[in-house]
Amino acid sequence: MKFFALFIYRPVATILLSVAITLCGILGFRMLPVAPLPQVDFPVIMVSASLPGASPETMASSVATPLERSLGRIAGVSEMTSSSSLGSTRIILQFDFDRDINGAARDVQAAINAAQSLLPSGMPSRPTYRKANPSDAPIMILTLTSDTYSQGELYDFASTQLAPTISQIDGVGDVDVGGSSLPAVRVGLNPQALFNQGVSLDDVRTAISNANVRKPQGALEDGTHRWQIQTNDELKTAAEYQPLIIHYNNGGAVRLGDVATVTDSVQDVRNAGMTNAKPAILLMIRKLPEANIIQTVDSIRAKLPELQETIPAAIDLQIAQDRSPTIRASLEEVEQTLIISVALVILVVFLFLRSGRATIIPAVAVPVSLIGTFAAMYLCGFSLNNLSLMALTIATGFVVDDAIVVLENIARHLEAGMKPLQAALQGTREVGFTVLSMSLSLVAVFLPLLLMGGLPGRLLREFAVTLSVAIGISLLVSLTLTPMMCGWMLKASKPREQKRLRGFGRMLVALQQGYGKSLKWVLNHTRLVGVVLLGTIALNIWLYISIPKTFFPEQDTGVLMGGIQADQSISFQAMRGKLQDFMKIIRDDPAVDNVTGFTGGSRVNSGMMFITLKPRGERSETAQQIIDRLRVKLAKEPGANLFLMAVQDIRVGGRQSNASYQYTLLSDDLAALREWEPKIRKKLATLPELADVNSDQQDNGAEMNLVYDRDTMARLGIDVQAANSLLNNAFGQRQISTIYQPMNQYKVVMEVDPRYTQDISALEKMFVINNEGKAIPLSYFAKWQPANAPLSVNHQGLSAASTISFNLPTGKSLSDASAAIDRAMTQLGVPSTVRGSFAGTAQVFQETMNSQVILIIAAIATVYIVLGILYESYVHPLTILSTLPSAGVGALLALELFNAPFSLIALIGIMLLIGIVKKNAIMMVDFALEAQRHGNLTPQEAIFQACLLRFRPIMMTTLAALFGALPLVLSGGDGSELRQPLGITIVGGLVMSQLLTLYTTPVVYLFFDRLRLRFSRKPKQTVTE
């Protein structure tokens, strides 16, 4: 009583306290960062190693395996995957959430150093690592195009000047440059000319290497001066290499230009990048796992004018893709939804109270509670993201509830003739415990979420804390500011109604009277109500089991990512043509704004595409509908497939795949894995629950298998090293020398001119110079035949692995796909030597599925404990919790009605309903207990009176919560796919619970009261006896 009086009778102090809360909130709001979702990225480090010309199997056994054994000893590694392809290996290390990325990077470097002695000696450089997840979509893509400069020169500008500068920007984890390679001098050898001159490929390589040497020459001193010695020991351009003498034949000089075509070109000619049908160099920028995407993008944009000045004017630097506009648009939509929710909630209060003066009170209390929450969010290190802003939107209905309960009770005393200040004190005292119970039990719902681990726990923590803080501030405001304003602003008379609102008042009275009559009938037919209540419990279980489930709603971020997978024996020239064809099909779609892509490198038969869609306001279709439309057109392209997926804000795992979800096959027997993977993939491709089924296992690449006749080689004076060196020199794009320039180093690349390698007959033109100086054709000591070989070798941990990726067809959920895959694996009878498990997002979904029911039960148990402590009763909490089954039925039915799967967002809605719907029961039970203690009423009379007296505040609080959530359901635009499941769940649950709990709660109250009396009499009878 003294606590309430302290604030009611000291209005200045109370107002200043509220102003202080508001000012702190405004300051916090201005300093809060902006993000699409809470920070949930796993710490990921990518290790890269290269050995030019090495086969995928060689890379896997000699490079990947030693590194994996060393890296696998690092503490906190939750997943390690590797992929080895032609000349390169990439190992992805995913760490536990609590592992510091910088500490992990130091351990990775130490592990690389420890494995160095086990790696092949021919590697051109040590393995390197980057603190970025290569499977994440780039946050920004920059393109360089020019009508003047070559692709190699553009790549040089990008990798030498732009990429290092961008990498230094805070938040940037990796800048991947694609579309070409560094400039180089290429030596294309003519094997017939070499044979005619008696010159071996090793002779050419040695001559070039010896002619381009950069060594210190020292200095001369003559007593008074010091002279630095400088020579022309370096060759820089193709023109300088052409006259190089590589051999003498019968006294005549054989120059490099006589036996080869020497050009200024690039290190790897098998690379291509394009943007909107124009050749381009791509800079794909990815952020650090812990970085804020908006701040990082803003920093890059601020740096662009400076970057533009460092490159020639003839080079056009453009932003091809930027993830931030859709994120900002989504957050703006949520902010608008929040404002609409506040307006609707205040309108509900006005309709019920029918007084502008009284409506001002919650109209002040709600903003103070919400704005004050921003200060706590800043102190907790949170951000303004979709989930935290949705928490505030939902909190609108909660925070007004507290003010409504206090305001309505004070208004009731005023209408009875009590003086304002006395009414404020008396009314607040009567409902103070009710408001406390409602708030604490609501916060208790989120305690299990705060203790939840893994990705779901990280994702939901900001939502739970934000909502809990808003409720806590609301509790303070409703017990301080609200009664003070009531005491000083409201008048001791019945408020005048506007004529247009009298009809609503009469309707409310009629509803209350109708409810009273129906409640009398229900209290006389309690068994029927009990059956209905049990039926709702059973229906909850059935609906939860049957409803489709997924991990997270499919987002429309306005960005698509596509992976091209062509025939494994395709040439680079044909693959470049496929890239152009696919890009034209996509570019012609009316919903597409920009398309960028590249192909080449170590995997000739694959490519990547990044597609930016037009803003949501300029297109009528969702990203998934656009993918469905494009899928039909893309299927007509022969010899290659383009798999499209919408980029999501949450992606788990480091695997680069062509679809959103993965199923990984593991085996210690590589032969068994290669035997069963095609069978499993073909079976999964027939399932209607899956789409775009593809695999990263590529073991049907064309290979030319050479078999040496070692006896013949020994007789001819040839060793295996010389033969292998011949093949590497001829076909491996061998880097044989380095050209040093002030800004970078470039390579001299040697191979047989591609004009002479159009078919396998090129091998017949190869020869080796033996130890007697004779030219011995390769066909004399080797035989060859076509064979199949893997284009990539994949590991997970230390086991051979193959990952099958898939998307979901429209109308299918991840739970449908998961169940279908499990059935298919059982039907196929896959042996125990091949193990299958979901990976990435699908794996997190499986783990979340197992914990959802436990989480809901834990929330209910927590609420029960809190209510039991508050009421000092085992029974009354059960009465209050009896409101939950009807809410669950309403929520699940609403999801079914809107064809929305049960996701993590819907789970949040269920948790919120546990806190919302019990408020009705709390108000009924509180007043019933008060009437029994002080009004000398029977339990039935007490609960009946409580239901009628609390009918208006129950309707007000329920409608306030419902209208607070309704904008989430009706909202469109960016990010609506995240908001709608939450709104659907809450609105559906509230409607159903409001219809049922007004009747079930009094019946359950009387049932437990009779049960209490029955058990309380038994001890007395025993004593009497």
Curated annotation (Swiss-Prot):
GO cellular component: plasma membrane
Classification via InterPro entries: AcrB_DN_DC_subdom, Acrflvin-R, Multidrug-R_MdtC
Bilayer topology term: Multi-pass membrane protein
Keyword Transmembrane: yes
Induction: The mdtABC operon is transcriptionally activated by BaeR.
Regions that span the bilayer: 3-23, 333-353, 360-380, 387-407, 431-451, 463-483, 528-548, 853-873, 875-895, 897-917, 953-973, 984-1004
One term of GO molecular function: xenobiotic transmembrane transporter activity
Keyword set, alphabetical order: Cell inner membrane, Cell membrane, Membrane, Transmembrane, Transmembrane helix, Transport
Cellular compartments annotated: Cell inner membrane
One matching Pfam family: ACR_tran
Function: The MdtABC tripartite complex confers resistance against novobiocin and deoxycholate.
Family affiliation: Belongs to the resistance-nodulation-cell division (RND) (TC 2.A.6) family. MdtC subfamily.
Subunit structure: Part of a tripartite efflux system composed of MdtA, MdtB and MdtC. MdtC forms a heteromultimer with MdtB.
HAMAP family: MdtC (MF_01424)
Protein name: Multidrug resistance protein MdtC
Organism: Escherichia coli (strain 55989 / EAEC)
Name of encoding gene: mdtC
